Amino acid sequence: IDRSYYYSSIHEELDKMSRMVGELLDFSMLDNQMSSMEMSRVNVSEMIEYLLLRYDAMFRKNEIKVEQEIEKNCFAYGNRMYLERAVNNYLMNAFQHTEQGKRIRITLKKEKKQIRMEVYNDGERIKEEQMEHIWDSFYTTSQKKKPVTSENEVRNIGLGLFVVRKIVDKHKGSCGAQNMENGVLFWLQLPEIRDLGK
């Protein structure tokens, strides 16, 4: 009997369970906090540009090409901290599924009184039978190309997209995903509010 193999397997399972419990507790706190979250005018354009700048070194280190087309002065009524988390989860989901030398494209635009953000990544398409479940809690397609590290500050055992939907729903928005020819596109929409400075 190769005891080292079994010890390693047990350690991996215990580590996975520990992270799942931590993620569940984290989500429970998030759900409670969102019920009384403070709302204000959020410049979504600046928020996304900030997050892209924050993760620029990580994308460069992994030789991932990042294309961005961010329309200026896209405002929504919401909680910036939670909206940042939703966008962050989309970006990290794309990062984890994109191989070196491939591309991630982020767009933000105003569309029919909505703000629409899209995050596309080159890579494996999601199987059709999995598509309807990716928003479920603790569901994962098991197609990730990279482990999650402290560098990106995200634990992902299958709650990332579930949290995105929860946050977007709280902001009276919508979100979804679709397979493209060479990858996957995730999107979210929020009601637009006018730039009061104009």
Regions inferred by a protein language model and the residue ranges of each:
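Short alpha-helical segment of the dimerization/phosphotransfer core of two-component systems
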Residues: 12-17
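Conserved catalytic submotifs in the C-terminal HATPase_c
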Residues: 38-41, 60, 65-75
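Short helix-loop "hinge" at the ATP-lid/N-box region of the Bergerat-fold HATPase_c
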Residues: 94-95
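Short beta-strand/loop element within the Bergerat-fold HATPase_c
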Residues: 101-113
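Short conserved segment of the HATPase_c
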Residues: 126-139, 146-149
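Short alpha-helical Gxxx[C/S/T] motif in the catalytic ATP-binding
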Residues: 160, 164
